[in-house]
Amino acid sequence: MRGKPLLQAKQGAQSFLGNLGDQDQASVIFFDHRVYPPIGPMQLGPGRAQLVSRIDGAIAEGGTALYEAIQSSFEAANERAHQDSSRIHALVVMTDGRDESSRITLDQLLSHLNAENSAVRVFTIAYGDQADPRVLGRIADVGQGSFAKGSAENIVQVYEEMASFF
């Protein structure tokens, strides 16, 4: 992802954070052919600018370890959900590609999402034509979230609609 699509994706994610409250917490996890350590979780009041800045500085590399990124993020969110059930715990996953780098399969991921006694919901966004809407829809369905399709023209709106769930 480069140029306008990357810029619009960043603006969408930043808009999503802007629509959350100061008392909300968020993490940002980047992935390409591997999953990077999370930035956060942090309370958005004091931490929003840092998360927005990190999103602004993101670069797109090759490869997509989508399933591993979802699994590791889900595990971390599930752990936080068990520690604090008073909050909404959810993943919002945006990808512009199909998984090609994970060491787990889609079926393994879906089993993991389905097997957990979890209050974590998984929302997915297919960005552009290379992402697989069928797979992302299944992940969102098993994760008790929702799926949306985004493009450079509407990704900010898609993120704003996702924020309305929170």
What are these regions (language model features)?
Residues M1-Q25, F30-F123, D129-F166:
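Exposed acidic/Ser/Thr-rich ligand/metal-binding surfaces
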